[in-house]
Amino acid sequence: MEARLLVLLCAFAATNADTICIGYHANNSTDTVDTVLEKNVTVTHSVNLLEDSHNGKLCKLKGIAPLQLGKCNIAGWLLGNPECDLLLTASSWSYIVETSNSENGTCYPGDFIDYEELREQLSSVSSFEKFEIFPKTSSWPNHETTKGVTAACSYAGASSFYRNLLWLTKKGSSYPKLSKSYVNNKGKEVLVLWGVHHPPTGTDQQSLYQNADAYVSVGSSKYNRRFTPEIAARPKVRDQAGRMNYYWTLLEPGDTITFEATGNLIAPWYAFALNRGSGSGIITSDAPVHDCNTKCQTPHGAINSSLPFQNIHPVTIGECPKYVRSTKLRMATGLRNIPSIQSRGLFGAIAGFIEGGWTGMIDGWYGYHHQNEQGSGYAADQKSTQNAIDGITNKVNSVIEKMNTQFTAVGKEFNNLERRIENLNKKVDDGFLDIWTYNAELLVLLENERTLDFHDSNVRNLYEKVKSQLKNNAKEIGNGCFEFYHKCDDACMESVRNGTYDYPKYSEESKLNREEIDGVKLESMGVYQILAIYSTVASSLVLLVSLGAISFWMCSNGSLQCRICI
């Protein structure tokens, strides 16, 4: 019996050998990423690609303030609605802001022809030079320029009119034919606006213009149109039964525009020499204007971010991330974060990389843990860690660079007659948005899968590197660990880590210990067989005795009748 106990003690002692394990870093990160095959994978490190925050303010764009129209809209501002006098001196802006209650547009009722196209043109204008195209005091000597006012465009309680147009009426009892031209010598496009008045009755036509069969003609090299007043009774709007239609054209440099009329002309007084700017645009927002600066503005607020995607608003001004419908776009840079339970087993062994990462290893992504007579400790493999960091950093930067095409995205303008086109445009935009969102999400899923596989591969490569050095001088015990058949001090451990392990030096000692341990295993197997047989016999005897006792008790109290027949 003493010999068998000695064999068991030898078996226990043989397992308390020097060990080295390969593992990876873990930390307390709660970052999660999605891959093609998994969702919410916790990782040690990750980068966010999706901006979802803004400051709730309208800011300067690259140092240039926006033009907030307040209660006025584009029409009221350009025509010069008296309610928009605060905007008369506005000449430059980074972007134009209308609000949800921008009601002051055309004060005298009528249609603004091609208004949506004009708004579209202004989306690329960053400033203009406002000038008198036809000076009021000298351009119309044979026509009245002061009596053309209306209660519909009142100012300070008195009848008034648009600040940038002149309502020409008859002078005395005549309205002689007028013809006035302007040559664009500004060296840039000039925006010219005018109107045509449509009285409700012939009496009004005569009292204003004298001529019953009046006309208005406007012509340039690219624009040529003749208008005749449509005299008809109409429901009153703003207490006006008449109507005014408003028109505009862009006059190219060097081109000439000519106005000819015998009545009903709302003549241009001021025009605008336009300066184009690719970063401008028109947005609708009720956010307040602040003294702040940004590179990207949305109707909800400014975005200060270098990320490639945002889910704040599809309408943007400036250098902005691409809008996607995603709620999460996080790219993994680190490893799966599965911290191991640092409990010690029978011989003080730690968990290896299969069971989880090491929070104790903080100076690298991959590395080693050793245990010998001199103690235990962690050591990162700096070379493989640095190679991985460089590779992943380059990949992340490449993805951000390729996807980070920042630009302005403003809505397109359609009038009431173009609703089918507008609906089709929305469907097309939605389709592109879905494609962008799908591509962004798929890119992140694929790259996350590749990154995590890349880390797994690096750990396996490190494991194979150690295995190829040790050969049969150590055995694999699972969990990414090797148990040496020889004593391995700190210098020996370092040689394994740096790839200079001297296999022949330890091979003889390993051979002897390996044979001794194999012998102990064979002997211990005999002990285990004896113990197993003894256990089986003992349990069988206990079962038989128990059955006999139960039967005797049941016979004695009549619960069981025993009959013996001969």
Curated annotation (Swiss-Prot):
Coiled-coil features, chain-numbered ranges: none
Covalent S-S links between cysteines: 21-481, 59-292, 72-84, 107-153, 296-320, 488-492
Keywords, in A-Z order: Clathrin- and caveolin-independent endocytosis of virus by host, Clathrin-mediated endocytosis of virus by host, Disulfide bond, Fusion of virus membrane with host endosomal membrane, Fusion of virus membrane with host membrane, Glycoprotein, Hemagglutinin, Host cell membrane, Host membrane, Host-virus interaction, Lipoprotein, Membrane, Palmitate, Signal, Transmembrane, Transmembrane helix, Viral attachment to host cell, Viral envelope protein, Viral penetration into host cytoplasm, Virion, Virus endocytosis by host, Virus entry into host cell
Extracellular topological segments: 18-529
InterPro entries according to UniProt: Capsid_hemagglutn (IPR008980), Hemagglutn_HA1_a/b_dom_sf (IPR013828), Hemagglutn_influenz_A (IPR000149), Hemagglutn_influenz_A/B (IPR001364)
Cytoplasmic-side segments: 551-566
Post-translational modification: Palmitoylated. In natural infection, inactive HA is matured into HA1 and HA2 outside the cell by one or more trypsin-like, arginine-specific endoprotease secreted by the bronchial epithelial cells. One identified protease that may be involved in this process is secreted in lungs by club cells.
GO cellular component, as recorded: host cell plasma membrane; membrane; viral envelope; virion membrane
Job description of the protein: Binds to sialic acid-containing receptors on the cell surface, bringing about the attachment of the virus particle to the cell. This attachment induces virion internalization either through clathrin-dependent endocytosis or through clathrin- and caveolin-independent pathway. Plays a major role in the determination of host range restriction and virulence. Class I viral fusion protein. Responsible for penetration of the virus into the cell cytoplasm by mediating the fusion of the membrane of the endocytosed virus particle with the endosomal membrane.
Subunit structure: Homotrimer of disulfide-linked HA1-HA2. Interacts with human CACNA1C.
Anything else known: Major glycoprotein, comprises over 80% of the envelope proteins present in virus particle.
Name of the protein: Hemagglutinin
Designated gene of the protein: HA
